[in-house]
């Protein structure tokens, strides 16, 4: 059994209030997420999870979609409250009736409690059924005036751990001849810089080697570009983080991904990691050229 304290977040609340956004936000924070787990299975599920050393943060979405099981949620929560190795927090999401009706109309969905009737009747019934659960929730968020980005930001502020910056910058060098990385958010082309490939002694080396690095960096256009690129990133990264992104992939490419892109990725990485959690990788550096 895992020796450390385990964290459980139960996401519940009104249909249309943002539970999916909340679950996705917690998933980005490293929580193992399960949607629509019947409450009666909660104690058994937790018995399985506590045996895993890799899962110490769990988020479960529980709502009235499984209405026939929902009556068992109170005793299930009582049982968890009596378990000393679990810290349970209930997150309840709600919104005003007018806002919920508007959201249902926008998505053209039926309310789960009134699939063939009035959306407002379904909302009223759901609000009444969830009143006791709302009363025992540690955190209640009204999303009426929140955009999804704002809800993600609120979730991040509430649940991010103090020892981890939830915004990670991934810097990657690559070669255009092998294709642009499909997961890149930002792509920068540095093929305009002088190419060490055409210098015989540097051809078998990479941008990690001192001779190549110094060669790439000695050109005025290199340093001018790097100054502008670092300034651009330092300006834009806080706004990407504000939008709720927890990861940003920045790809820097040259022809083969061996020299220029590697050197510049190392330089930019050292600048960015002074303020942000940063990982550096070189996708194509070890590739062998086909003869």
Curated annotation (Swiss-Prot):
Signal peptide interval: none
InterPro entries: P-loop_NTPase (IPR027417), RapZ-like (IPR005337), RapZ-like_N (IPR053930), RapZ_C (IPR053931)
Pfam families in the record: PapZ_C, RapZ-like_N
Keywords: ATP-binding, GTP-binding, Nucleotide-binding
List of residues binding ATP: 13-20
Binding-site list for GTP: 63-66
Keyword presence, Nucleotide-binding: yes
SUPFAM superfamilies: P-loop containing nucleoside triphosphate hydrolases
GO molecular function annotation: ATP binding; GTP binding
Its biological purpose: Displays ATPase and GTPase activities.
Family the UniProt entry places it in: Belongs to the RapZ-like family.
Protein name from the UniProt record: Nucleotide-binding protein lin2617
Species this chain originates from: Listeria innocua serovar 6a (strain ATCC BAA-680 / CLIP 11262)
